[in-house]
A protein has these predicted regions:
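Helix-loop-helix
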Residues: 1-238
Length: 238
């Protein structure tokens, strides 16, 4: 258990804390809100290879969807289905579980960010690297009226709305697929409608800085998804 806590602290919590302190110290007015947005952008850049691979996997899965349905209809035996699907994925260079890694990384990041603000300001000097100095003062008012150290309903709502649009955009163009595929349709419904509601109620209980992180992360994800879609359309016209 100690080893797991050490890994979590050194890979997620301390880098996140020190990055936030660094940006806060460097920004004019010691603006914590801008520091959270900058830190989110850095995290997005670091995780870009994983999320980019996940998006391309989704596009490939959409292309081979008719072949997947054919395998399910022609092979009623579960073992034969599994072998046929693995052969199909290998032939098209698709790893259906590659996207889960990007999603799994988000959870410890959210927990670590919550821990950073739960401990509050001033930042714990003992957790900072030797070359990072905590600022004497920190501006915790984002846009002049949102207190980032306290829950904020409006920022939580914005995070949920962007989560909705991000999930909607992530769906393959062409709808929810075959109506007979009730499992797929149920999962898509949960991702589009239920998960944003869950995001709102979770974010509403946490410091607004976490909501700001969630909002910024979804905003950058929407831009990324839109760029990938535009590239796919451009490639299709060539």
């Amino acid at each position: 258990m100690y080893f797991i806590k050490l890994i979590y602290s050194e890979i997620f919590y301390r880098p996140l804390l020190n990055g936030l302190v660094f940006f806060t110290s460097m920004l004019p007015g010691r603006d914590l809100g801008l520091a959270v947005i900058l830190l989110t952008l850095i995290i997005k850049i670091i995780t870009f290879p994983l999320t980019h691979k996940m998006l391309h996997t989704q596009k490939k899965m959409k292309k081979i969807e008719p072949e997947i349905k054919k395998i399910y209809s022609e092979n009623k035996d579960k073992e034969k289905q599994a072998h046929a699907l693995m052969a199909l994925y290998k032939a098209h260079g698709v790893s259906p579980f590659s996207g889960f890694l990007a999603l799994l990384i988000q959870m410890p990041l959210l927990i670590a960010l919550y821990q950073v603000f739960w401990k509050g300001i001033p930042f714990p000097q003992s957790e900072l690297y030797a070359f990072i100095a905590a600022p004497d003062q920190v501006n915790t008012l984002f846009l002049g009226f949102i207190q980032l150290m306290q829950p904020n309903m409006w920022l939580a709502a914005l995070a949920a709305i962007l989560q909705f649009f991000q999930a909607k955009l992530a769906l393959p163009s062409g709808g929810a697929g075959d109506k007979s595929d009730t499992t797929q349709r149920a999962l898509q419904f949960q991702m589009i409608y239920f998960f944003p509601i869950l995001v709102f109620f979770i974010a509403f209980k946490l410091p607004a800085a976490v909501s700001l992180y969630w909002t910024a992360m979804n905003f950058f994800a929407i831009i990324h998804e839109a760029a990938v879609r535009r590239q796919a359309v451009s490639d299709g016209k060539q």
